[in-house]
């Protein structure tokens, strides 16, 4: 029975080990080793079983009956053995461990011989020791599994424990020579822990190599290691074999315990037998001499988690946090106030980083480096030449994208229409010419202001609330320039106050604000809209922004100005003056608006005088074919009437000439109808009128506006049209009469004697157009307020262009006196067209000409 007891005990051990392997999921190689071991045990059992019958043959010869009974008992025992592997043993049950520890008075005890009893007692003692060790191992297994359920991090230690325990028997022979090395390693670990406690800042961030566990990569850690990313620091230990003792079989680290050199994880490792033996030894060492204590393991993992929380952040994360804090403390440094291209962004980034870079003044049109002050705007050479060619050749551009192209340095040549429109909106004009050069100090201050604006705009800039919503970085830059020039300008503007007090002698003036600079300022033009709905005046928000931009640029150029507001209170004029140095905006003051007469405060609050000047000036230049530049080199040619051989009488000949001349004259005047309509749409406030009022103003004021434009080409003998063809005095008398021709020539000669510029002619034409006393107007007061604003703009322009001239104060009343004369010529001209209305069937007139003068047309021309 001892043999059977041994056999059952061996099977119980095998079952227990299989259960342990199932719990911890051993690898296939370890399972194969256990299977081989199980087969060896089965072979030993079979060999002992074969020897057992040979010893019992002598006893069986004495009594055959007893042998038969014993044979039956053996068969019964074999049947029981076949059923034993099917039994589901509990690895932790005392039944499996002590099933055959029967008492001494058992009935089966006397059936064995004394020799076998002695051998069985020795074997039982050995088996008892093994059972105790195995029982302790199973208890540790249960403790570790419970710890894993409580904290998943315990799997790292438990997995290492079970792997080493599974290999304990295979390396039992090699454990004894390695015990001394383990003691040294334990001593080294204690020293490292003491060093870490003394120097927490110099903790070693070491990592064990990855351990394969069911296809997942885990970090096997010891009590001196930390969780975290792999460190590249190669720390040298006092012991030569400090790093080799932590290698695992599946690690990617190089380990050489024989050489004792320390290497970092991830390095190239030579797959040698020494590293494999070292890994096996380290695993077996931990299983044989150090039994896993669940409490110690839990405290170790908790200590490691605490160290992980106290681990300092990487350097890159610290830098990102510092940069974020700097951005919160200095948000203004993150704004770029440079150009709209790559060079400006690079410059602003260099300034933010503290790198000094040479700043430059940008071009107002494309953002390129400005070469100077051209046509009233700081611009580059490319935009200066483009604008000069455009105004000299009068090129008409077209945009394929509805005038919404972006104009920057890289693509400024793609759309000429949008580029020219941006030149106009930036303030480029033939009249906006500077007198003198920019002082050197002003240029230096401009450069300093540009560099400081790139670093961040100061918070002390005074910006109007109306412009803050649409403020552009360039506005901030130029407002900073005027802030730097404030002290210099305060010393210059004082003598100019006396000059502008002469405005008290002017007649009735609307309550608007006037800025009269000592040197010609360059306010920005209002944008010329591409759609008819946006025409008829400058948008108030855009105009304020444009004006703020250019008023500050004018101040930066060394000019200074005086804020003059003439208001009417109780029928008496009052001059409200004050210095205006470094002003951010040109809007009307609140107290001045409240004192305006006849409700003009709304108009004065929406548009400034300079907005009106520049809007009307640009409208005139774009839509008038009689400007100074266009007429300077005009090739003049006479209009010759062909001979009529059919006419038999003088009356018939004169009628033929009159018909032919009207056809020629109307054909050349009709293009001016469309131009004047476009000009009227761009006059500030015109599109706010009702459609009926707009139609009345254009139809009744067309000839008067056209005559104001063409007066430059009228002399005592001829009237020259925009194509160079001229009509003689005799031909004009054929069209009209001698009285009308005399009045027309006198008016033109007088107007030419005043020497008006294109801007002044445009403003005067707008005044003529905005006649509030036309018959049939529904809102004459609204038209009258718009006319007063234009009249004030003309007055300011005259004083500005003729500063110091004695005729400056007399010119505006003279021009206002010419308006009734012009109205009389318009009425006479309308009456002369009655002949065309009566004889419209004899000649073919352009439909637009016939429509604007109420001349009947054929049905096919409607």
Curated annotation (Swiss-Prot):
Skewed-composition ranges (Acidic residues): 47-82
Primary location recorded for the protein, binned into one broad class: nucleus
Region of interest: Disordered: 28-83, 97-138, 173-210, 230-353, 444-557
Molecular function in Gene Ontology: DNA-binding transcription factor activity; sequence-specific DNA binding; zinc ion binding
Presence of the UniProt keyword Lipoprotein in the record: no
DNA-binding region: 360-435
Compositional bias ranges of the Low complexity kind: 173-206, 230-291, 308-335, 342-353, 447-460, 475-508, 539-555
Family: Belongs to the nuclear hormone receptor family. NR1 subfamily.
Protein name: Ecdysone-induced protein 78C
Organism: Drosophila melanogaster (Fruit fly)
Organism classification: Eukaryota, Metazoa, Ecdysozoa, Arthropoda, Hexapoda
């Amino acid at each position: 029975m001892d043999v059977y007891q041994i056999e059952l005990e061996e099977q119980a051990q095998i079952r227990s080990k299989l259960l342990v392997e199932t719990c911890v999921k051993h690898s296939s190689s370890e399972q194969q080793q256990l299977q081989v071991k199980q087969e060896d045990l089965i072979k030993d059992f079979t060999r002992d079983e074969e020897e057992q019958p040979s010893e019992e043959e002598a006893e069986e010869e004495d009594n055959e009956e007893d042998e038969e009974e014993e044979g039956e008992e053996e068969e019964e025992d074999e049947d029981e053995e076949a059923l034993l592997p099917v039994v589901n043993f509990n690895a932790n049950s005392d039944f499996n461990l002590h099933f055959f520890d029967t008492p001494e008075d058992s009935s089966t005890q006397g059936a064995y011989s004394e020799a076998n009893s002695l051998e069985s007692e020795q074997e039982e003692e050995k088996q008892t020791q093994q059972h105790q060790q195995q029982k302790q191992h199973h208890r540790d297994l249960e403790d570790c599994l419970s710890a894993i359920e409580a904290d998943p991090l315990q799997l790292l230690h438990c997995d290492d424990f079970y792997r080493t325990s599974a290999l304990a028997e295979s390396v039992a022979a090699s454990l004894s020579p390695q015990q001394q090395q383990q003691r040294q390693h334990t001593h080294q670990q204690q020293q490292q822990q003491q060093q870490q406690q003394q120097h927490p800042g110099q903790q070693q961030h070491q990592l064990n190599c990855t351990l394969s566990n069911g296809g997942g990569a885990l970090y096997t850690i010891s009590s001196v290691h930390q969780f975290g990313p792999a460190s590249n620091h190669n720390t040298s230990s006092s012991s030569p074999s400090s790093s080799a003792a932590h290698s695992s079989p599946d690690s990617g680290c190089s380990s050489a315990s024989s050489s004792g050199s320390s290497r970092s994880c991830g390095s190239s490792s030579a797959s040698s037998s020494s590293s494999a033996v070292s890994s096996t030894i380290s695993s077996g060492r931990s299983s044989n001499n150090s039994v896993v204590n669940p409490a110690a393991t839990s405290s170790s993992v908790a200590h490691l988690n605490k160290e992980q929380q106290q681990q300092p952040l990487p350097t890159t994360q610290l830098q990102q946090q510092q940069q974020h804090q700097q951005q919160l403390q200095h948000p203004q440094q993150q704004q770029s106030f440079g150009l709209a291209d790559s060079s400006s962004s690079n410059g602003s980034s260099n300034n933010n980083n503290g790198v000094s870079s040479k700043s430059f003044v940008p071009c107002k049109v494309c953002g390129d480096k400005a070469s100077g002050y051209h046509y009233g705007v700081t611009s580059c050479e490319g935009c200066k030449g483009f604008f000069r060619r455009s105004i000299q050749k009068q090129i008409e551009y077209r945009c394929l994208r509805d005038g919404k192209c972006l104009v920057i340095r890289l693509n400024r040549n793609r759309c000429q229409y949008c580029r020219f429109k941006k030149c106009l909106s930036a303030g480029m004009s033939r009249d906006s010419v500077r007198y003198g050069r920019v002082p050197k100090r002003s240029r230096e201050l401009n450069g300093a202001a540009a560099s400081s604006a790139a670093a961040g705009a100061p918070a002390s800039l005074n910006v109007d609330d109306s412009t803050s919503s649409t403020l552009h970085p360039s506005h901030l830059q130029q407002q900073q320039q005027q802030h730097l020039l404030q002290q210099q300008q305060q010393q210059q503007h004082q003598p100019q106050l006396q000059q502008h007090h002469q405005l008290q002698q002017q007649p009735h003036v609307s309550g608007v604000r006037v800025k009269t600079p000592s040197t010609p300022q360059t306010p920005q033009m209002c944008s010329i809209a591409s759609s008819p709905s946006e025409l008829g005046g400058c948008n108030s928000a855009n105009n304020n922004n444009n004006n703020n931009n250019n008023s500050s640029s004018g101040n930066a150029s060394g000019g200074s100005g005086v804020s003059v507001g003439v208001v009417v209170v109780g029928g008496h004029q009052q001059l409200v003056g004050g210095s205006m140095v470094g002003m951010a905006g040109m809007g009307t003051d609140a107290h001045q608006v409240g004192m305006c007469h006849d409700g003009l405060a709304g108009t004065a609050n929406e548009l400034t005088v300079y907005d009106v000047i520049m809007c009307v000036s640009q409208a005139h230049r774009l839509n008038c074919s009689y400007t100074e530049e266009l007429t300077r080199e005009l090739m003049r040619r006479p209009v010759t009437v062909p001979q009529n051989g059919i006419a038999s009488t003088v009356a018939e000949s004169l009628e033929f000439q009159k018909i032919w001349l009207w056809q020629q004259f109307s054909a050349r005047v009709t293009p001016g109808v469309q131009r004047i309509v476009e000009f009227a749409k761009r006059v500030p406030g015109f599109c706010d009128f009702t459609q009926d009022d707009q139609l009345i103003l254009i139809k009744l004021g067309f000839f008067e506006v056209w005559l104001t434009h063409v007066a430059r080409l009228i002399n005592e003998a001829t009237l020259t049209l925009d194509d160079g063809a001229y009509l003689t005095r005799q031909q004009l008398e054929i069209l009209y009469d001698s009285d009308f021709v005399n009045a027309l020539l006198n008016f033109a000669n007088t107007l030419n004697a005043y020497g008006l510029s294109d801007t002044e002619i445009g403003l005067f034409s707008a005044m003529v157009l905005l006649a509030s006393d036309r018959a049939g107007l529904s809102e004459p007061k609204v038209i009258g307020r718009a006319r007063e604003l234009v009249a004030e703009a003309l007055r300011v322009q005259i004083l500005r262009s003729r500063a110091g001239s004695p005729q400056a104060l007399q010119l505006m009343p003279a021009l206002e006196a010419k308006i009734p004369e012009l109205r009389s010529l318009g009425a006479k001209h309308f009456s002369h067209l009655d002949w065309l209305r009566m004889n419209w069937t004899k000649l073919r007139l352009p439909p637009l000409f016939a429509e604007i003068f109420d001349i009947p047309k054929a049905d096919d021309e409607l």
